[in-house]
Amino acid sequence: MGNGMCSRKQKRIFQTLLLLTVVFGFLYGAMLYYELQTQLRKAEAVALKYQQHQESLSAQLQVVYEHRSRLEKSLQKERLEHKKAKEDFLVYKLEAQETLNKGRQDSNSRYSALNVQHQMLKSQHEELKKQHSDLEEEHRKQGEDFSRTFNDHKQKYLQLQQEKEQELSKLKETVYNLREENRQLRKAHQDIHTQLQDVKQQHKNLLSEHEQLVVTLEDHKSALAAAQTQVAEYKQLKDTLNRIPSLRKPDPAEQQNVTQVAHSPQGYNTAREKPTREVQEVSRNNDVWQNHEAVPGRAEDTKLYAPTHKEAEFQAPPEPIQQEVERREPEEHQVEEEHRKALEEEEMEQVGQAEHLEEEHDPSPEEQDREWKEQHEQREAANLLEGHARAEVYPSAKPMIKFQSPYEEQLEQQRLAVQQVEEAQQLREHQEALHQQRLQGHLLRQQEQQQQQVAREMALQRQAELEEGRPQHQEQLRQQAHYDAMDNDIVQGAEDQGIQGEEGAYERDNQHQDEAEGDPGNRHEPREQGPREADPESEADRAAVEDINPADDPNNQGEDEFEEAEQVREENLPDENEEQKQSNQKQENTEVEEHLVMAGNPDQQEDNVDEQYQEEAEEEVQEDLTEEKKRELEHNAEETYGENDENTDDKNNDGEEQEVRDDNRPKGREEHYEEEEEEEEDGAAVAEKSHRRAEM
């Protein structure tokens, strides 16, 4: 049994081992097959790569062979072209040698001709050198003469300038003194005007108070008449009571009527006093009024309640009531006098406050008139309210009148005080707003004036630049024409024309001087006609250059044309002077008409006086600006004077005719320098007048 069991176990083990070996063998075979397959695939891929590489190499070899064949063909073509080019070059070389030989022969012939011409020009140059030396000597002599005359004129100019500066300083002092006097007079006039307005307002207030007092007196009279009628009725009732002995003891209703009759004057007076206290705002008078009215009221109460206790007193006559009424009249007069005093004190306080506000804010007369009108309207409104209060308090002469307590009166007074403070604050704010508006307007005007001044200065600078550029251009043209004349060998004709030009320029300068001396109306030309009149010296220089330069040109043969142009210009001068005179006459006529209109309307005169007070500062600013303009113009005149002198020195090198012209021009300018200053001053005065007229 044991062996059988062992054999079985060994079989099983053997079987399992066999199975394992089979399995492992199968797995090993599979792995070998897989590796062989992979190696086969790699070998196929390598074979494909080599095959493709071989194909590409064969294609490249074919391309190389084709390119080689093409290069061989192109090389053959280039060899043929090179042979042709070599043959053409040999032909061109022969032709070039022939042309060079011809050019050398031509240049030699030209050189010989130019050499001959050069010798001729040398001889001409030597002749011109001699003429130039002669002209230099003449120029030196004339330069010495010119320097002497220039120094003399400069000394005269400095002397005249010093004299004019002294005169101008004196005139400035006189103008300053006159302005100070004018300011003082205007201040005095303004103070008197304000005082007059205050007095007028006080007079109006007093008239209104007088009317109010008349109304109160009439009301008191009507109340007294009503009281007298009630007293008469009371007498009749008393007589009837005395006649009927059974009605000695009065009814309570009659007793109430009696007390109402007794208290009616007191209630009426208190009600009458209430609106006056609301308008006048005087607290102390209320206490006085109540003190005056309290004692008679108590006496009447005691005397009127007495008949209820004793019948004998009803038989007495009503004399105590009349005595009380008579006593009350002087007390009412005293109260009215106290009211008047209080009103006067309040008016004085208001006047003092107004003066204080005027000193702080310094309002204009127009603002004061506006404030007074507003105050007058407020007072009229208060009077209307008072009239409505009267109508509401006692619409008829009834005995029952509502009495106002002291607490309510105090509240009413506080309310009125707050209202007055608010109104005063509103007035101050309104005044400040008006003052700021005026300041803004003044600043805007100053800015506009500055902008206008800058624009004028820019225009003057542009004009000066143009005037400086024109003479240089003309001088260049003149020099070019002079050299052309020298090239054309017409030196002798140029000298003759230069002499004629000198004579014509001298005559024209004399004519200009005669016209300037014989035409004094041109001094008063307005300054604001255009930017050209702002710089008269530069304009005169430009006119002289335009008139003289074309005639001085040595190549210019048209003397007749220049003479005709001068005649036309001289004929046009009287027409321009007539137009200027007509414009001045029109301005004077407009000023006379405005003066007449202002004289015929007194309200307009007062308004103009107020506007003059406001325009003082603007006029001072304008005068300062005009003075600065004058200084700038004088400085520009001096600079242009020096530049013109330098230009004359440069122009003397061109010929004798230019020296004569440059000598005459500064002389004429120095002679007319005073006239130009007067024209500038007159123009500034006319500009100020026109500006004032525009503002008016």
Curated annotation (Swiss-Prot):
Keywords: Coiled coil, Endosome, Glycoprotein, Golgi apparatus, Lipoprotein, Membrane, Myristate, Phosphoprotein, Signal-anchor, Transmembrane, Transmembrane helix, Transport. Residues 38-107, 176-248 are annotated as: Golgi targeting. Residues 35-244 form a coiled coil. Residues 604-626, 673-683 have a biased composition (Acidic residues). Glycans are attached at residue 257. It is found in: Golgi apparatus, Golgi stack membrane; Endosome membrane; Membrane. Phosphorylated probably by c-AMP-dependent kinases in its lumenal part. O-glycosylated; modified by sialic acid residues. Residues 2-12 are cytoplasmic. Residues 34-696 are lumenal. The keyword Nucleotide-binding does not apply. A lipid is attached at residue 2 (N-myristoyl glycine). The modification Phosphotyrosine is found at residues 613, 673. Residues 80-175 are annotated as: Endosome targeting. PANTHER family: GOLGI INTEGRAL MEMBRANE PROTEIN 4 (PTHR22909:SF22). Belongs to the GOLIM4 family. Plays a role in endosome to Golgi protein trafficking; mediates protein transport along the late endosome-bypass pathway from the early endosome to the Golgi. This is Golgi integral membrane protein 4. It comes from Homo sapiens (Human). The gene is GOLIM4.
